[in-house]
Swiss-Prot record:
It comes from Halobacterium salinarum (strain ATCC 700922 / JCM 11081 / NRC-1) (Halobacterium halobium). The gene is moaA. Belongs to the radical SAM superfamily. MoaA family. This is Probable GTP 3',8-cyclase. GO terms for molecular function: 4 iron, 4 sulfur cluster binding; cyclic pyranopterin monophosphate synthase activity; GTP 3',8'-cyclase activity; GTP binding; metal ion binding; S-adenosyl-L-methionine binding. S-adenosyl-L-methionine binds at Y27, G72, S120. [4Fe-4S] cluster 1 binds at C21, C25, C28. Pfam families: Mob_synth_C, Radical_SAM. Its cofactor is [4Fe-4S] cluster. It comes from the Archaea.
Amino acid sequence: MLEDDFGRDVSGVRVSLTDRCNFDCVYCHNEGLGDTRGPIDPRENELSTDRVVRFLSVAHEFGVDAVKLTGGEPMLRSDLEAIIRRTPDDMAVSMTTNGTFLPGRAADLVDAGLERVNISQDAMDNDAFAELTQSGAYDAVLEGVEAALDAGLAPVKLNMVVFEPTAGYVPEMVDHVAARDGLRLQLIEYMPELAGHPEWAIDIDRVHDWLADRADRIETREMHDRRRYWVSSRDAGSTADDAAQSVTPDGGAHPDQGMVEIVDPVGNPQFCANCHRVRLTHDGYLKGCLNRNDDLRGIGETTQSMRAAFRETVANRVPYYGEYMTRTDDGGWEINDDYLDVEGDRDPYEYAADDSA
C-alpha cells in the first residue's frame, strides 16, 4: 500500500463515472450537466468500461481494497453493472446515487457485486426536495431507497448536505432514520469552496452539539475522523440512561436506534489527517484531494501509464486544511503543536470499526 509524505496510506479510490446528472441541486458545483437521458453508453469524454476496470486493477495492485462509484449520477451509465462485475474480487464496491434509477436495477447491481449504497435525500418534504434538487423526483427517490433495502443493501445511507436551506430539516431526518430499520443518515457539511455561496454555510458544531445531547452513544470512525451518533427513536421511549442496553453484542444498534454520521471537512485538519482516498475524474484524471484541481494527472490508456500516475498522485498528496504536520530537522514529519492540539479538539473516543464508506 502506498503512503504519501504525511504518512497517510491510500486504501480507497473514488471513481466518477460521469459528470452528467438528472438533478440540478442548488448546492452542487456540477449542476445538471450534460445529456441526462439514461441509462446510456459512456459519452466520448467519459472513461470507457475497459479503462475504469484497468484502473481498478492497478489500484488493487497498490493495496487499494475499496472503491466508491460516483458521478454526477453514476446510474446514467448503462455499463455500471459490467464495471462492478469486473472489479477485483476482494475490492469492496459502494456507490453514491440519487436513487431514481435503483428500482429495476438494484437487484442486478447487488448480483454484480455492489455492497453498499449512499442515496442523496436532503429533505422529507416533496416541495422542499423539489426546490433543493430542481426536480420532481421525490417519490422516485423514496422508491429507490425501498429498492435498495429490498435488494439487501442495508444499511442504506441517506446523504444530506447541511446548509442554510436544509438545516431546519435535520431533526426530522434524524427521527426518520432512528425509527426506520435499515437506514442511516450522513450529514455532509456544505463546502462553499466547491459550490460558492459562502452565506449558505452554517456552524456545523451546532449540529454536533445537538446530536450529542440527543445521542445514546457516540463513537468516531478513523476515516476522516468522522463522529457517529447512535440515536433512539422517540417512539421507542429510550433515553441516554438506556445506552448500555441499546448496543447489540456485535457493537451495532437495536432496530429502534439509528446512526447519524457527520462529514465535516471545512477547516478541519483532523479530517485531512485521516483521509486515505484518491479520486479519479470522469474524464481520466487522478487527483489527491477533492478540493484541489491543481494536481490533476492523466491516467492514460495503458496499465503502465496508470501505475505511474497513481504513484505520482499519492506521492504529491498534501492536506488541504492546514499544515497539521511539519518537517523535522532530519527530514521527517511531526505534529504541528502550534496549529493543532495533539489531543485534538474532540473527546478521545476509541475509533469504531470502519464498516461502511
